[in-house]
Structure formats: structure tokens, C-alpha cells
């Protein structure tokens, strides 16, 4: 029979109605002569009542059995305010077991004490948990808001190919061998970058898609080998146009999903200032903890670690807490991960100074430190010395650790900003050359146009990242549409004419036929969903993710394939 209602639908308005419900048995409780059953589906939970005369209906019934019941809705004597259906219950008149269930390998509750690989192995069970279903519901809502908003602004949703050409820039590609074209490979795209720019040349002036992308890179909590982007591009538009639409869209999402208001325009911070103040190009602004440079305070110091300070920076973070020995040791271990031996620290409480450097401080330095950090009653200063980039990274990481130690990362608070004025190039130690910091189609800023290819160290990109709560959730740029500038860019990243023609000739040919200026952005929808659901990992907002080693624990992919399949592809494996 067809269900008349879901398990999250019945209210007092349905009292005395005969209903049919279908779902999974969540819990069975005996109370005197009666038995109570919690029946669940993705919409909620309804309490069922089995009276004494119908007790035979539940012989051998167990948790996670799939059942169908028919019964009468009645008002509950004791209301359960945690449930939408908490004012009613259903007196069961008939019950059918649709399918039985074995004992599940872990309890299907929101708080579950089981390792993640077990959850991923039985992902279909893990997804029965309400918290996981809510994550997918919120993710679907975000997608729905995006589609409605962009469609109303005349954006056209266009699909681009998954089988593409491998190009030399960016992260590693996943390669797909072609059976029909021996010894040749497709690449799964890291983004639809070139295709969306071709759509601009095609006259599709406002494009978007919610698209799967692929990168063969090391994994972490906010990365997967396959991930989902909102990809967006606009013709006859500048960076400002893209940023304005992005701000309005993220404002709408936060309002409708979290009932959280943000003010436009968002804060803008240059890449240089982000590194200087927060040690990161994706700073979490839910807490202060700015990084300070203390070279002036210690310039004539006799402190041994600061004697050799030429071309080095003394940088510090201060928190109005007194760190314990255990907490300081945690920061020491973190410093070693950044190739520092340890951290130095200074504690002050009611003008009493202690710590690894306290005895070596002059009274003048103490006064300067109090003024520098605006210390009131107590504080701990964490500091070290090193090359600017390295010490800034360390202090940025320590800043985050301190926030976690003292619960400064406020839940349901969302701090957004734009990081702008990125370097156009970054130096690759591995390749011993400058490479494009984003991709070679990012336009230099106007002030860098004259010499970006000869002054690579200082060249700035017309690029922008959208940051929320310490995560980069979007990144975009103004694109190069001038063939002369594009050629200079290829030369700057040491791609010769033969390489350009082989890898990008098909793309560059399109620019011979009239290209509008255009700009765009890509949002990481997995990361946005992770933040808005307060999840610990993007794996918790993806239905069937890979684990931290890139393995699908259910199907054991990737896996070996047969020799016959390899022969068809003209591939041999090497042990």
C-alpha cells in the first residue's frame, strides 16, 4: 500500500485519522502491557503504540527492520517537544515487515563512537543517521538557492566535458586511457576553466554550472579527489561585477540556510596584509589574535636567539590567557612541523613576568610589550624568529591552535572577506622557475601590466579569493583576453611556442575570432556545506566520499583490473 504520510508530518490536526506509514524501526520500548516503537524516515520520527491485543504483530521485530503500519492518530499524553510529531502517536492496527535487517555494525545514532573507515564501509547505514541526512538536505538547499538566484539573473546552466585534454599547469590530473585512440589519454578536468572561457567567446555571456572536478593531490579534511564547484563566468564584466554577485549570493545562502545576516560590501584584505596580520591567505576573522612584528622592540637586545636578526623577523601572537605547560608543549610540537626547534614564550600576570625569555627582558621592553599587545591583567606571548614567509606561516598556525585551545571559533558565526592583490607568480623550488600562482589565464593587475614578465617577484594578479571562517570557499580572476599579453604570460612561465601550441593551441585559436573581456569565480560547495553544517570534514557532506587515502571503503576502489581490460587499452602494469 502507499503511505499516506511521512514520519515527520503528523500533528494534532491529524487526530482520529487512519494513516499508513512506512519506514525503519529506530527503537523498541516495552512499558507494561504496551510496546512503543519509534518509526523513522528522512522526514522525522513518529511514535507507534502496540496495544496488548495486537502484541503478536511485533513478534521478532528488531531495530532497522523496514515496516509498514496502518493505524489511528491519537493525542499523546506526554508531549515530546524535540519531535515535530511530538504531540501525537499512532495506535497500530496492522503491521507488515517489508524487509528484515541484520544487526548493524554500529549504532545508528547522531553521536556514534566508531572509526571513520567503518562508517565509510557501511556508508548506506551511516547515511540513515539524522545528522548525516540533515547535511545532505542542507547541501541540496544550497544548490537550489544557487540555481534559482543565478537563473533569475539570466545565467545559463551549461554542462562542459568531463573527458578533456591534459595541460601542464596546476595539480596532477587523473588520466583516462582511450581504447579507440591507442596510447592516448583524456584528463579529468581540475576545473572547466578553458571551456567556460570558450563559452564567453561563444556568446554565452552569463554561464554557471554545479560541476564535479578532479585533482590527484594529497588529501586533507577539506579536500577530496573528486569535488563539486559552483563555476561561474561573466562576459563584459570585471572583477567587481563577479565579486558583487558572489557577495549577494552568499548573503542569500546564509540568510535562508542559517538565518544569518551579513553586511555588504565584505571586508577586503590584500594578500600581503593577510599574511602580515594573520599568517594566512585565508584568515579566520571570528577572533582577533593578530600577528605582531617585534624587531623594533628587540633590535638592541642581548637575548641570544635575537642576536642574529639580520634579514629575519621576530613575530609574535598574544592571547589574554595563561597557557599551561601541556599547552605550551603542544605549540612546541607544532613548531617542529614548521622546521623550528621550539617556540619562545613570555607570561605576564598582574605585572609578574615569567617564561623562557622573561628574565632577559628589560623594563623598557616589558613596557613596550604591554603597549604593543594592550595587555591588561594577564597574557601569554608566543614568539620566534625566522625568515618572513616561514615565521609568518608558523605564527598563523599557532594563532589557529590558540583559538581552538580557548574555544574562540564561535559556532553559527560567519566571518567573510575577500583576499585580493595576490602574487601573479610563485617560485617553484622543485622546478626552479616561476609558475602561475593561479593559472596562466589570470590577468595581471593594471599596475603590473608593463613589467609583469620581467618583474615576476612583485607582479600582482587581478585575482580574488572569498574566505569564510578560515576556509577559502571561492576563487576567481579577471581573464586575459589580449593575445599579446597572453603570449607574454606563456613566456613568463617558460612555455615555449611548441608547448603552447600542443597544449593550448585549440583554445588560443578561439581568440582570433573576437573575445569579450570576462571574469569569473569558482566556489567550493563541499567546503561551504561543511561550514554551514558545522561538520568536521567535507566527507560528512558528501554522500559517498573517499577516505583520507583516496579509497572508496565500500567498493574498494581503486582496484586491480583484468589483463583483458589492460590489453584493450594497450597498457601494461609494472610491479
Curated annotation (Swiss-Prot):
> Which GO cellular component terms, listed alphabetically, does the Swiss-Prot or TrEMBL entry include?
cytoplasm
Q: Which UniProt keywords apply?
A: Aminoacyl-tRNA synthetase, ATP-binding, Cytoplasm, Ligase, Nucleotide-binding, Protein biosynthesis
This enzyme catalyses: tRNA(Asp) + L-aspartate + ATP = L-aspartyl-tRNA(Asp) + AMP + diphosphate
Q: Where does this chain mainly localize?
A: cytoplasm
Which molecular function terms from Gene Ontology are attached? aspartate-tRNA ligase activity; ATP binding; nucleic acid binding
Q: What is its EC number?
A: 6.1.1.12
Q: Where is this region: Aspartate?
A: 193-196
Q: Where in the cell is it found?
A: Cytoplasm
Which Gene Ontology BP annotations are present?
aspartyl-tRNA aminoacylation
Q: Which family is this sequence assigned to?
A: Belongs to the class-II aminoacyl-tRNA synthetase family. Type 1 subfamily.
Subunit structure and binding partners: Homodimer.
Xref: PANTHER family:
ASPARTATE--TRNA LIGASE, MITOCHONDRIAL, ASPARTYL/LYSYL-TRNA SYNTHETASE
Recorded protein name is Aspartate--tRNA ligase
Organism encoding this protein: Mycoplasma capricolum subsp. capricolum (strain California kid / ATCC 27343 / NCTC 10154)
Taxonomic lineage is: Bacteria, Bacillati, Mycoplasmatota, Mollicutes, Mycoplasmataceae
Amino acid at each position: 500500500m502507499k503511505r499516506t504520510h511521512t514520519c515527520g508530518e503528523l500533528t494534532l490536526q491529524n487526530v482520529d485519522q487512519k494513516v499508513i506509514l512506512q519506514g525503519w524501526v529506530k527503537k523498541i520500548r516495552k512499558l507494561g502491557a504496551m510496546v512503543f516503537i519509534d518509526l523513522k524516515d528522512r522526514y522525522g520520527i513518529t511514535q507507534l503504540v502496540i496495544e496488548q491485543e495486537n502484541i503478536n504483530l511485533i513478534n521478532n521485530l528488531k531495530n532497522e527492520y523496514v515496516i509498514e503500519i496502518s493505524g489511528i492518530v491519537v493525542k499523546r499524553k506526554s508531549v515530546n517537544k524535540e519531535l515535530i510529531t511530538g504531540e501525537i502517536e499512532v495506535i497500530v492496527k496492522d503491521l507488515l515487515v517489508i524487509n528484515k535487517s541484520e544487526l548493524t555494525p554500529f549504532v545508528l545514532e547522531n553521536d556514534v563512537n566508531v572509526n571513520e573507515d567503518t562508517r565509510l564501509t557501511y556508508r548506506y547505514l551511516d547515511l540513515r543517521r539524522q545528522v548525516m541526512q540533515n547535511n545532505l538536505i542542507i547541501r541540496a538547499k544550497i544548490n537550489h538557492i544557487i540555481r534559482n538566484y543565478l537563473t533569475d539573473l539570466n545565467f545559463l546552466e551549461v554542462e562542459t566535458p568531463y573527458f578533456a585534454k591534459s595541460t601542464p599547469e596546476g595539480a596532477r590530473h587523473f588520466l583516462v586511457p582511450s581504447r579507440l585512440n591507442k596510447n592516448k589519454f583524456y584528463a579529468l578536468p581540475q576545473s572547466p576553466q578553458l571551456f567556460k572561457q570558450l563559452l564567453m567567446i561563444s556568446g554565452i555571456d552569463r554561464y554557471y554550472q554545479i560541476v564535479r572536478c578532479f585533482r590527484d593531490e594529497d588529501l586533507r579534511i577539506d579536500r577530496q579527489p573528486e569535488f563539486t564547484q559552483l563555476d561561474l563566468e561573466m562576459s563584459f564584466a570585471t572583477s567587481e561585477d563577479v565579486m558583487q554577485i558572489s557577495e549577494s549570493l552568499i548573503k542569500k545562502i546564509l540568510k535562508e540556510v542559517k538565518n544569518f545576516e551579513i553586511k555588504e560590501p565584505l571586508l577586503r584584505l590584500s594578500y600581503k596584509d593577510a599574511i602580515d596580520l594573520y599568517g594566512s591567505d585565508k584568515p579566520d576573522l571570528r577572533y582577533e589574535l593578530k600577528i605582531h612584528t617585534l624587531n623594533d622592540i628587540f633590535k638592541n637586545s642581548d637575548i641570544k636567539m635575537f642576536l642574529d636578526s639580520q634579514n629575519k623577523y621576530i613575530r609574535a601572537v598574544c592571547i589574554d590567557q595563561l597557557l599551561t605547560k601541556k599547552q605550551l608543549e603542544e605549540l612546541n610540537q607544532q613548531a617542529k612541523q614548521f622546521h623550528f626547534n621550539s617556540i619562545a614564550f613570555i607570561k605576564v600576570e598582574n605585572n609578574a613576568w615569567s617564561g623562557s625569555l622573561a628574565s632577559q627582558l628589560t623594563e623598557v621592553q616589558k613596557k613596550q610589550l604591554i603597549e604593543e599587545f594592550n595587555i591588561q591583567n594577564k597574557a601569554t606571548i608566543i614568539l620566534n624568529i625566522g625568515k618572513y614567509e616561514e615565521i609568518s606561516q608558523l605564527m598563523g598556525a599557532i594563532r589557529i591552535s590558540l583559538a581552538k585551545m580557548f574555544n574562540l571559533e564561535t559556532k553559527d558565526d560567519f566571518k567573510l572577506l575577500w583576499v585580493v592583490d595576490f602574487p601573479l607568480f610563485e617560485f617553484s623550488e622543485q622546478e626552479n622557475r616561476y609558475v602561475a600562482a593561479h593559472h596562466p589565464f589570470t590577468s595581471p593587475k593594471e599596475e603590473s601590466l608593463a613589467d609583469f614578465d620581467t618583474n615576476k617577484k612583485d607582479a600582482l594578479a587581478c585575482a580574488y579569493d572569498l574566505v569564510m571562517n578560515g576556509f577559502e570557499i571561492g576563487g576567481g580572476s579577471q581573464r586575459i583576453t589580449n593575445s599579446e599579453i597572453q603570449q607574454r604570460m606563456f613566456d613568463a612561465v617558460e612555455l615555449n611556442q611548441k608547448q603552447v601550441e600542443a597544449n593550448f593551441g585549440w583554445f588560443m585559436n578561439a581568440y582570433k575570432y573576437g573575445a569579450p573581456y570576462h571574469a569569473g569565480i569558482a566556489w567550493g560547495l563541499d567546503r561551504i556545506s561543511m561550514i554551514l553544517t558545522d561538520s568536521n570534514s567535507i566527507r560528512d557532506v558528501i554522500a559517498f566520499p573517499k577516505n583520507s587515502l583516496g579509497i572508496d571503503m565500500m567498493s574498494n576502489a581503486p582496484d586491480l583490473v583484468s589483463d583483458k581490460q589492460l590489453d584493450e587499452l594497450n597498457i601494461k602494469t609494472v610491479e
